[in-house]
């Protein structure tokens, strides 16, 4: 199970701590592949317990690593307690930067504001903007929380920016040039940088 919890991809180390996700994004790689990078399988037979994640960390070779990323075949904030504990565990043992890749729906998942505690646990946050407007977002992301998801994601991003300098939005270039340009405008309006990622199926 160790390989599934921690894996390397493009010279970075990723923590896959849950398979739970409130979204069904049309472009999500987990729709077509069982793994990416050096992982053999990112689908869990059961959700990993905290002790299993610790064991995976203790056994993993972090050579040449300077940043770990919470990102896998699930939304990391679905396992928020484990995320917080694992971040603390890493910080006590390694000098790594810690990044969270998230859909930004943590407040809806937990029915409360979560930005402050999350920002205390990580060094940077990358939030999947995905689309520049609510209608397009709902069509592509298909969030379990419906129409309120888009505004909740934007609010979460703005809240994070109050506590952490390194917060950014991301979109994938497959959405098209027009949507990318609109996303740049929206990101600027919210005072948050935007990174355009190349789609790699």
Predicted features along the sequence, with ranges:
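A generic local structural motif
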Residues: 1-2, 54-57, 111-115
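Canonical Radical SAM [4Fe-4S] cluster-binding loop centered on the CxxxCxxC motif
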Residues: 3-49
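Flexible, charged surface loops at secondary-structure boundaries
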Residues: 7-9, 61-63, 119-120
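Short, basic/glycine-rich phosphate-binding loops at helix/coil junctions
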Residues: 32-38, 64-68, 133-137
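Short Fe-S-cluster ligation motifs
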Residues: 48-73
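Conserved AdoMet/S-adenosylmethionine-binding subsite of the radical SAM
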Residues: 73-201
């Amino acid at each position: 199970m160790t390989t599934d919890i921690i894996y390397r991809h493009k010279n970075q180390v990723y923590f896959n701590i849950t398979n739970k996700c409130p979204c069904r994004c049309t472009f999500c790689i987990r729709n077509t592949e069982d793994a990416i990078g050096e992982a053999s399988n990112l689908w869990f037979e059961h959700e990993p317990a905290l002790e299993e994640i610790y064991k995976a960390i203790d056994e993993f070779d972090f050579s040449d690593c300077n940043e770990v990323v919470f990102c896998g075949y699930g939304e990391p904030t679905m396992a928020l307690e484990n995320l917080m504990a694992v971040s603390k565990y890493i910080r006590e043992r390694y000098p790594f930067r810690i990044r969270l890749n998230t859909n930004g729906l943590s407040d809806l998942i937990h029915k409360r504001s979560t930005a402050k505690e999350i920002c205390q646990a990580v060094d940077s946050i990358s939030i999947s903007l995905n689309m520049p407007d609510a209608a397009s977002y709902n069509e592509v992301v298909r969030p379990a929380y419906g129409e309120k998801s888009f505004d909740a994601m934007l609010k979460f991003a703005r809240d994070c920016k109050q506590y952490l300098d390194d917060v950014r939005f991301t979109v994938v270039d497959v959405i098209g040039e027009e949507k990318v340009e609109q996303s740049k405008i929206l990101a600027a309006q919210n005072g948050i940088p935007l990174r355009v990622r190349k789609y790699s199926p």
